[in-house]
Amino acid sequence: MAADRTGYIHDRRRLTAALLGPEAAPDPHPAPAHVVRGTLTDISPHMLGLATPEGERRFILTPQTTFWYGGECAPRELRPGQDVLLRCTPGAELVVERVWADLARATGVITAVDGDTVTVATGHDRAPVTAVIPYRASGRMRVRHPRLEPGYLFDAVGVRDGDTVRALIPATTQPPYPVVETPRRPPQHRSSAQVAGIASWYDPVRGQDTDTDPDGMLMGVAYPALDRTGDCGPACDRATPCAPLPLLSLGATVRVVNECTRVFAVLPVVACGAAASHFCDRCTVCDAPASGRIAELTLAAFVALGGQPESGCWSATLTVGGL
Amino acid sequence: MSETLQDVQLWILTAVLLLGAGTKAVDRTAQGPAVLLPVPLRRPFTVAHAAVEAGLAAGLLFCSGGAAYAVRGATAVLFAVGLVALVRLRQRDPEMGCGCFGGLSTEPIGWRALTRSGLFLAAAVATFGLPHSGWAALVHATPWHGVLCAAEVAVVAVLSPELREAVVRLRSPVPCELREVSRKQMVRRLHASREWHKQRPLLASPEPVDTWRHGCWWFARFAGQEGDREFSVVFAVEVGRRRPDVRSLVVEPPAE
């Protein structure tokens, strides 16, 4: 039955295009060759080995290669077995430009707080995340999240530490009210096929089995305006997003442009962005005025479009065809 | 003259309470004074508030004698408590709408909402001495009633930002790609279409195997069968138009 459903979802784009025209459901772009994810097997000053679902791969490190593991770090701080994401130099896919190790994120609504440990509900279709705020990050976390209490929003980027996320960098400025008291969004009277806002990221595999699971490199978006009557389901806990996003279902394709780098891709809707739908924040990365999260990209797609995962967002434009 | 004015208050209060109850019943999300309550109580409070308003409206229109005194007293109490709640809400959350007419009351509580609430409180108090019901007054209405009623409606309209909001919504409804629709509603529209009747003999079952949404279009996929040949019949139904455009397509399974 589940296989049937997956097959039906897979067919939706083809059938939508057949009835509304090809511009309604363009072909999704494949994963770019210059972004690679896997498990670190070995690292030396000049070479990096990675176990990926396609097999063992080796990459060249140069003096210009930068490393991130909770902050800028030296290559010797990385250890075999870590979940590693690489961005290589476009056109020279063996030369590494930047390396991120054990990236993780906790985005959603706080459900419990115990000292420096915060439990975050990340949406009806994802397991809750436990985030631990280390003492050295607590100051900057408190500035952007003044209310670490159940019911308030939380969004932080950090590194994976077993089953928990060590939250190091705040990725939003928390609204001063709990989610249930969010002011009602005024009804939208105007719409357009093109919506401006911000794009964030999530990890569809939560850093697990990136050497064998191809979903670690999944290119897609979790969409904050998934149709409630169909895919979002009876447990749907998404809010009405503050950007006027057209209602879509899983399998649709959208064109996402990173307004900071002007890189774009056509990506399929692969999940519900229930957590993102609560955020009506702005992105300071390239100072765009638009607010509201319009897409939560998979980690691979976010980096492929030129994003820095540690900054958490970029200004984006999302286009839906065939409306 | 004084009795004519009292009669008009009964009608105005009845109309206002009915409109308030109707708009709150349509949009049951907590607004206005309901947000002063704990979260689990907000929605039940909104429903109860709408029921009380509808009950009082019926009482104002049809009760006379002792029952009328009770209903008019309760109406005055309702508006007095409402006025206090609005002042309190304005202090706590200056951006919040009064919620007096459900989702239409989006403008932050200002002098207009407070004056209007005070006016309704005064109107409720003014009806205390009247021996007959609103309905009896309506049956024996005179041209003076009409003049006074029109003047008071004009005053209330000036004090009501909801009118502008209602006009905006009527003129430019929610665009079709943002409009939430129920599956039942879309199935009904599909069944009423010519395309459905044309393709119906091909369907193996009237229940869709998959449904999805793409902006202004809702799609339903059905299993189809003709002899040994199996295929799918897909319908696309436009959202938002009273007479929606419906398209259909017969799709052969992809070759193995």
Language-model features: locations:
Chain A
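Short aromatic-glycine-enriched beta-strand elements
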Residues: 45-50, 115-121
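Glycine-centered tight beta-turn/hairpin loop motif at sheet-sheet or coil-to-beta transitions
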Residues: 54, 124-126, 262
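A cross-kingdom feature marking solvent-exposed beta-strand/loop segments within repeated
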Residues: 24, 58-76, 94-95, 127-146
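Disulfide-stabilized cysteine-rich extracellular repeat microdomains
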Residues: 45, 55, 64-66, 115, ...
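Short domain-boundary/entry signatures in modular proteins, especially
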Residues: 32-33, 95-107
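A generic structural motif
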Residues: 51, 121-123, 255-259
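Secreted/periplasmic proteins
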Residues: 1-28, 34-37, 42, 77-88, ...
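Hydrophobic residues embedded in beta-strands of well-ordered beta-sheets
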Residues: 48, 93-96, 118, 163-165
